[in-house]
Design a protein with these regions (language model features):
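Intrinsically disordered, low-complexity
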Residues: 1-48, 98, 149-160
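Short, compositionally biased
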Residues: 3-10, 117-130
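Catalytic cysteine-centered active-site loop
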Residues: 41-102, 113, 142, 149-153
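Catalytic Cys-His active-site segments of thiol-dependent hydrolases/isopeptidases
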Residues: 75-81, 122-145
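Paired acidic/hydrophobic, glycine-rich loop segments that form the ligand-binding mouth/hinge
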Residues: 105-107, 124
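A generic structural signal for residues embedded in beta-strands
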Residues: 107-108, 133
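Flexible, gly/ser-rich surface segments that form the specificity/activation loops bordering the active-site cleft
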Residues: 109-117
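Short loop segments at secondary-structure junctions
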Residues: 111, 127-130, 160
């Protein structure tokens, strides 16, 4: 099944409520697809830096390393998104925007913060111009549109 990702896709039914059904998305590696699928399953979980390693709670970097750990890649255990980015860059795992596939990691730099490349946020690309990330305490883990124009210094990586 390399190159195929199953994700939940919302649609409204006749009664006006939302149905969630599986939709297949092409592209991505087997591990990347699995990490993306796991990330989608975390949508609705809470956001907390203090409880980032407890069941049902994530911050942005713990969402990435825990989804990838569940998919079989255990080296992404940095305390921050910047730590994860530095490891992936140093090990030659970056990709360009045109190469993005489900499971790839998107790193955000908003302002100078003294961390590696000023990275302060991270998300998992799930295909179809969408991503999953632990947004903040009020939103928790969410599925959002991916807008590359929001990135000041784009950095994308594909763990292997």
């Amino acid at each position: 099944l390399d190159g195929v990702l199953d994700v939940y896709e919302p649609s409204s039914n006749a009664a006006g409520s939302i149905d969630w059904s599986w939709k297949r998305i092409a592209g991505g590696s087997e591990v990347g697809n699995l990490a993306a699928q796991i990330a989608v399953s975390k949508v609705g979980c809470g956001y907390s830096q203090a409880m980032r390693d407890e069941e049902g709670w994530y911050d942005c970097s713990s969402l990435v390393y825990r989804c990838y750990a569940e998919a079989g890649i255990t080296y992404l255990n940095g305390k921050t998104a910047a730590d994860e980015a530095k490891y992936l860059v140093e090990h030659g795992m970056t990709v360009s925007a045109s190469e993005l596939q489900p499971g790839d990691i998107i790193f955000y730099s908003y302002e100078s913060n003294g961390r590696y490349r000023n990275i302060s946020h991270v998300a998992i690309y799930i295909g179809n111009d969408e991503m999953v990330h632990a947004a903040n305490p009020s939103r928790g883990v969410v599925r959002d549109p991916f807008r590359p124009s929001n990135l000041t210094e784009p950095l994308y990586a594909r763990p292997q």
